[in-house]
Swiss-Prot record:
Entries under InterPro entries matching the protein: MetalloPept_cat_dom_sf, Peptidase_M12B, Reprolysin_adamalysin
Protein name: Snake venom metalloproteinase HT-2
Keyword annotations: Calcium, Disulfide bond, Hemorrhagic toxin, Hemostasis impairing toxin, Hydrolase, Metal-binding, Metalloprotease, Protease, Pyrrolidone carboxylic acid, Secreted, Toxin, Zinc
GO biological process: proteolysis
UniProt key word ATP-binding: no
GO CC entries: extracellular region; plasma membrane
Regions crossing the membrane: none
Reaction catalyzed: Cleavage of 10-His-|-Leu-11, 14-Ala-|-Leu-15, 16-Tyr-|-Leu-17 and 23-Gly-|-Phe-24 bonds of the B chain of insulin, His-|-Pro, Pro-|-Phe, and Trp-|-Ser of angiotensin I, and Gly-|-Phe of Met enkephalin
Cofactor(s), names only, from the UniProt record: Zn(2+)
Organism: Crotalus ruber ruber (Red diamond rattlesnake)
Role summary: This protein is a zinc protease from snake venom that induces hemorrhage.
Length: 202
């Protein structure tokens, strides 16, 4: 597939519960997020997408939105905050909120569909559900996938020996890839929405 070279300038925000969970150690959180983004880049290479961590913001004093166990409400608040505050402060294409709260209904992440480059909706919410960076990378790559137009694969989807990243639930495994269906969804998103913000070089 001839997918264009795209660049996602990503901001990750770690909430106050994350700060407390990691004993107020900024370096631990930083290292973790960098490793997560490294995995995301490995997954997205097949789609010709480069993800760069433009900024990592850690809410060390307090949360700037109300983080609650309702994923829907928290995602909505985060989108509003991104549009009104974060976008004015730093140019970026997408923001992901990393929270240590336990989300309702066994939710590990939530994101808007077809929303990359949208001022309010180019966001995702990720629960810090596993100490394993690979699995966190899969979760964030999955939510970013929704932002890029990808719907869920079947629950048993495999690509060769790898588990498909857009499976509805997270199955622990050793290797993960985007399915052909995910690539087609992304191509369709590019054709329909023409997301200018990821087509420019950072």
């Amino acid at each position: 597939q001839n997918l264009p070279q795209s660049y996602i300038e990503l901001v990750v925000v770690a909430d106050h519960r994350m700060f407390m969970k990691y004993n107020s150690d900024l370096n631990t959180i930083r290292t973790r997020v960098h490793e997560i983004v490294n995995f995301i880049n490995e997954f997205y290479r097949s789609l010709n997408i480069r993800v760069s961590l433009t900024d990592l913001e850690i809410w060390s004093d307090q949360d700037f939105i109300t983080v609650q166990s309702s994923a829907k409400n928290t995602l909505h608040s985060f989108g509003e905050w991104r549009k009104s505050v974060l976008l004015n402060r730093k140019r970026h294409d997408n923001a992901q909120l990393l929270t240590a709260i336990v989300l309702d209904d066994y939710t590990l992440g939530l994101a808007y569909l077809n929303s990359m480059c949208h001022p309010r909706n180019s966001v995702g919410l990720i629960q810090d559900h596993s100490p394993i960076n690979l699995l966190m990378g899969v979760t964030m790559a999955h939510e970013l996938g929704h932002n890029l137009g990808m719907e869920h694969d079947g629950k048993d989807c495999l690509r060769g020996a790898s588990l498909c990243i857009m499976r509805p639930g997270l199955t622990p495994g050793r290797s993960y890839e985007f399915s052909d269906a995910s690539m087609r969804y992304y191509q369709k998103f590019l054709d329909q929405y023409k997301p200018q913000c990821i087509l420019n070089k950072p």
